[in-house]
A protein has these predicted regions:
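Charged, terminal alpha-helix-loop-beta segments
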Residues: 1-156
Length: 156
């Protein structure tokens, strides 16, 4: 019998947040969600993760990668760099330092070429971009994460 596939609709950001949180191991083995809907300065981060190395990951979710998403993450990331002690108090289990700031993960339905060009110009140490697919496979709901871009810059 052949497998059957059908794309499922993700209704809103809240639904996407739950799908990602419930399936975060599909993004990266060892990644755990430790917080959600965190306000960092004036910017909201959808999910906060902790990876297998103990690094904090700011996870931004949306349907399309656009300037608004990029600016929101830049604002949140800047706040993290400006107030590292507050971040350490919020997440004492995380390994945070100037040499090891939070990672950035974008999880969107569609990444544009212009978005990828822009993030390559940023000075974040670690950025990962994923596209998600919510599918029904043989009657079962599954979420697939396609790792589209990984950027790593040397620490100063």
């Amino acid at each position: 019998m052949r497998p059957t596939f059908r794309k499922l609709e993700v209704k809103d950001i809240g639904h996407l947040e739950k799908l990602v949180a419930d399936n975060v191991e599909g993004v990266e083995p060892g990644l755990k969600v430790v917080d959600s809907r965190l306000l960092l300065g004036h910017a909201a981060i959808d999910l906060v993760g902790l990876d297998s190395r103990g690094s904090l990951a700011l996870i931004a979710l949306d349907f399309t990668a656009d300037e608004g998403l990029l600016l929101r993450v830049m604002d949140a990331y800047s706040w993290c760099l400006e107030f590292p002690d507050t971040l350490r108090r919020l997440y004492p289990m995380a390994q945070l330092s100037t040499a090891r700031p939070p990672r950035i993960l974008f999880i969107v339905e569609r990444l544009t070429d212009s978005f990828l060009r822009r993030i390559k110009q940023l000075s974040f140490l670690e950025i990962d971009c994923f596209e998600f697919r919510h599918l029904e496979v043989n009657g079962e709901s599954v979420v697939f994460f396609d790792h589209v871009e990984r950027l790593r810059k040397a620490a100063a």
